[in-house]
Amino acid sequence: YTSKMHVISNGYESRFTPKRQRKADEPSPVPFRIVASGRLTNEKNHVALIRAIARCRHAQDIELVIAGTGPLKKRLQRMAGRLLSRPASIGFHRNADMPALLRSGDLLVHPSIADLESVSVIEGMAAGLVPVIASSSLSAAGQFALLDESLFPVDDVDALARRIDWWIDHPAQLAKWGGTYAEHTKTNYSVESSVRKFVAMEREAIADNRR
């Protein structure tokens, strides 16, 4: 391509509003709810997430919710039942219920090996969740990370466990960055923001064509 390229997000729906963040002096809750969302398939790598939680220092305090459907559902449920200290919820959630589900969480983990835009990560950030995202050459999701503690090498179970423990150990940072991610997402990835960028792109293209 010889023309200028513009990358514009699909955007997220305005019903994904941010949750109320905890006060800076509040400890991490027990149970500490980790939310993941996506197809229950190999490339989404929820197996790594379950294994990582099992290796966390705070494993006994963590509750896992994975919203999605797919061929690995029963395998993931069996694995979670065997490895995790608390019962996990793994399965279908209505789209209408997703904003409330995300707001009920404390941390968003996206362990996927392969992705396109990862709208589920955008929706989680819009809801005020700090993301912990797999850094993968086959996924675009890593671009959403605003600090190192939001990234881990793809499929590195021990690194993911350390990231999860770090956020549980630092509740003030979790609250601060939850608000930061929500504001950043609203500014850069809302449908309104995407429309503005698209209109600006069209105007630029028209102006260039007239030269």
Per-segment meaning from a language model:
Residues E26-K44, I50-I53, V65:
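Conserved donor-binding/catalytic core segment of Leloir-type glycosyltransferases
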Residues R75-H93:
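Nucleotide-activated donor-binding/catalytic signature segment of Leloir-type glycosyltransferases, i.e.
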Residues F92-H93, A100-G105:
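Short alpha-helical donor nucleotide-sugar binding micro-motif in glycosyltransferases
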Residues L146-V157, W166-P171:
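Conserved acidic donor-binding segment of nucleotide-sugar-dependent glycosyltransferases
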Residues V130-A134:
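Short hydrophobic beta-strand element within catalytic cores of glycosyltransferases
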Residues I113:
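Aromatic "clamp/platform" in nucleotide-sugar-dependent glycosyltransferases that forms part
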Residues A172-E204:
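A charged, aromatic-enriched C-terminal amphipathic alpha-helix characteristic of glycosyltransferases
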Residues G11:
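Carbohydrate-associated surface elements
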